[in-house]
Amino acid sequence: GSYTGLRIGVSEAKGLCFGLKVPLIAVHTLELLACATMFKTYFDEDVLYCPMIDARRMEVYTAVYDNALNAVRPVQACVVDENSFADLLADRRVVFSGNGAAKCKEVIRHENAIFVDDIVPLATDMLALAERAYRQGQFEDVAYFEPFYLKEFIATTPKNKVL
């Protein structure tokens, strides 16, 4: 599942950084999605970026970033309804992206809501974020770094175990 894939990727990155004696830089998926949205869309005015990852049913993992990718609203799990983000939408345009945004399009109806489809972050989109972290010396401890899960990771054994 996604937890296992994330743990494998983090373990590989930690091993490479340790072996090559290079710093480990973590890039949050939602921040990366916001960055990719900025690179692939062009808005002259001051907008907010709200990347969303589908968390099943009407729940999404989300955060809100400004044009400089500063967090305006922290990462959170959110059940989306018609009043979600109303405070932000009242003041300015908000660009929603990611697979979680697609299911929210019919629920969040506001003239300041912009839904952008088909934003898939690429490794090249990560460069600006990694460079900023490098310049600011924001490195992770290779020995103790753990993936950031919004929900608690619970390891289970499959019910239908086939031998």
What would you call each of these model-derived segments?
Residues S2-T29:
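DPxDG-like acidic metal-binding loop motif
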Residues G19, A36-K40, L129-Q136:
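Active-site catalytic microenvironments for nucleophilic, acid-base chemistry
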Residues P23-P121, Y149, I154-A155, K159:
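Surface "functional belts" at beta-alpha junctions
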Residues V116-L163:
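Acyltransferase
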